């Protein structure tokens, strides 16, 4: 079976989904499928992978086609449109990632027109929070006239959690659904490097108790809660330092820094910017506690990575992974409402109880290694693809 994955960007600066696709493609290639990925040359706002534009690059068992983007918004790519029109019929299945993007919508439309079944993974873009808080009017119009027809003719919908499925179906998704949790490279996270790389790069963290937030800097991540939560926590734990690891839109990040200044936190927050590779792993090794106070997450890859690293984790009900973890086992995560007081109380409890931290970290690491692996994700998608291939094709 030959499968094409389509996503607007593979830049890790965009967070979990963009970082996940290479793992997914590799797992499917290892499972015996022929896999290609088509994307733009986007490397975050104002940047592009200049050396990769308009070419096919061989990766570990699969190929990636990079096409030049013409716009930041919507990631319009006319070279992609020309290519997908001529090549979509080369594939048995098209797996579309994310919606409200030119590449994803074009791929679905051309696949439908040529009778190639397509599967959609919305990756949270149909969640209620995003529909209401991100370009609400534009999204409502686009959804009605562009995305809704695409959803209607999808062979199936893939959701990362039951919570994501509920919200997408409330938004109007009606295609057959499959819930497949995302997988991560637990082998790397089980054997972390030492904290020295991080501590040498950010020496102000030495001798401190590290509270780690490691994710994209975005309004949905609850950073407006995290800052006052840390201000409250610091009163009882003066050695605590908050590490905010991630990148985001300049205006939004500047607003966060101003908020931190007004709270008197300037000397106790380390703004690292985007961390990847050994820097990211070393940050996980240096951390005492991981926190993700998001309002909305269709899964929560950053949380899963912290669990796999053996960190005690504090999160909120808006992170869909939390619901799935709690349904599988108790005493793995601390999950409290997305409000300052309960978050501050829970964070203080974690920092003050070493035994609790050790227990939660060990349980989290065990669950991640046993139930959220790349191989299990690949096997589940291979099975789903086979089921779609055996289903009657819809007529354009």
Question: What do these predicted regions represent?
Answer:
Residues 251-254, 266-276, 283:
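Active-site donor-binding acidic/aromatic loop of nucleotide-activated sugar
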Residues 4, 158, 204-221, 227-230, ...:
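Conserved donor-binding/catalytic core segment of Leloir-type glycosyltransferases
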Residues 39, 143-195, 204-206:
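Donor nucleotide-sugar binding/catalytic pocket of nucleotide-sugar-dependent glycosyltransferases
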Residues 295:
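Aromatic "clamp/platform" in nucleotide-sugar-dependent glycosyltransferases that forms part
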Residues 327-328, 332-340, 349-354:
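Conserved acidic donor-binding segment of nucleotide-sugar-dependent glycosyltransferases
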Residues 41-44, 184, 214, 241-257, ...:
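Glycosyltransferase donor-sugar binding loop
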Residues 1-52, 56-63, 89:
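N-terminal subdomain of nucleotide-sugar transferases
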Residues 312-316:
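Short hydrophobic beta-strand element within catalytic cores of glycosyltransferases
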